[in-house]
């Protein structure tokens, strides 16, 4: 059984992600330090989180996990970012002053009250897929342009990429008048603004198909 490392930032959804990983047939292991990546011989990494951008970066720094996580991604090893874990892949956030992991160009912005009903964006919302993206290479037969599944969201900030050509925008979501990039892919990265671990069978399917590909 493959070990799937779940990075512990102490930011919310560790338990539910661990249960989801177990339910789809993998062995979840909690990563608290860089040495855990080696000792657990992880096949993939998951970076979950809900809450403060700066606090998450601060905790990764204190656990000396910033560079190991960046190296893992740079080596094209399987990586899943969930909610805050997606946002941390970018340069920084309106929420604070700390730099992100800078895997992608762009920043994380707060919802504008003039465009949305209320903040945070919490609950179920529909995903829209682009028929010309390459998500079928990652989770074939389901993530497809003519299917519009629903997923569960909890967030007050959203990513604003500078250069969408550096990765594949695999799905969009609309909240009020605001368009949200709700999932992206790049090489061996799958990152979602929604919570697959809380999105029922659809969310579990996404995780299983991606993690089973490696």
From Swiss-Prot:
Q: At the top level of its lineage, which domain of life is listed? A: Eukaryota
Give start and end of each Glutamine amidotransferase type-1 domain: 3-214
Report the EC code(s) recorded for this entry: 4.3.2.10, 3.5.1.2
Query: Which pathway does this polypeptide act in?
Result: Amino-acid biosynthesis; L-histidine biosynthesis; L-histidine from 5-phospho-alpha-D-ribose 1-diphosphate: step 5/9
> Which Pfam family, an example, fits this chain?
GATase
Q: Name one GO biological process term.
A: L-histidine biosynthetic process
- Cellular component annotations (GO), alphabetically ordered: chloroplast
Task: Kindly indicate whether the keyword Transport belongs to this entry.
Answer: no
Q: Which GO terms describe its molecular function?
A: glutaminase activity; imidazoleglycerol-phosphate synthase activity; lyase activity
Q: What positions does UniProt annotate as the active site of this protein?
A: 83, 195, 197
- Assembly description: Heterodimer of hisH and hisF.
Reported function: IGPS catalyzes the conversion of PRFAR and glutamine to IGP, AICAR and glutamate. The HisH subunit catalyzes the hydrolysis of glutamine to glutamate and ammonia as part of the synthesis of IGP and AICAR. The resulting ammonia molecule is channeled to the active site of HisF.
Task: Note the HAMAP family from the entry.
Answer: HisH
Protein name per UniProt: Imidazole glycerol phosphate synthase subunit hisH
């Amino acid at each position: 059984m493959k070990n799937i490392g779940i990075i512990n930032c102490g930011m919310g959804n560790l338990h539910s992600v661990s249960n989801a990983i177990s339910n789809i047939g993998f062995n979840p292991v909690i990563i608290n330090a860089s040495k855990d990546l080696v000792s657990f011989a992880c096949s993939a990494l998951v970076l979950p989180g809900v809450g403060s951008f700066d606090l998450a970066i601060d905790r990764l720094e204190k656990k000396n996990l910033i560079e190991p996580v960046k190296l893992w991604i740079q080596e094209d090893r399987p990586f899943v970012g969930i909610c805050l874990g997606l946002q941390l892949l970018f340069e920084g956030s309106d929420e604070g002053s700390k730099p992100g992991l800078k895997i992608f160009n762009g920043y994380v912005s707060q919802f504008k009250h003039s465009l949305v009903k209320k903040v945070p964006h919490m609950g179920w919302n529909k995903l829209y897929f682009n028929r010309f993206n390459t998500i079928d290479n990652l989770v074939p037969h389901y993530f497809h342009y003519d299917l519009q599944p629903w997923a569960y969201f909890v967030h007050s900030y959203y990513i604003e990429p500078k250069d969408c050509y550096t990765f594949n925008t695999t799905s969009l979501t609309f909240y009020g008048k605001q368009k949200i990039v709700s999932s992206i892919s790049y090489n061996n990265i799958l990152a979602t603004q929604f919570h697959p671990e809380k999105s029922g069978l659809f969310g579990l399917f996404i995780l299983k198909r991606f993690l089973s590909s490696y």
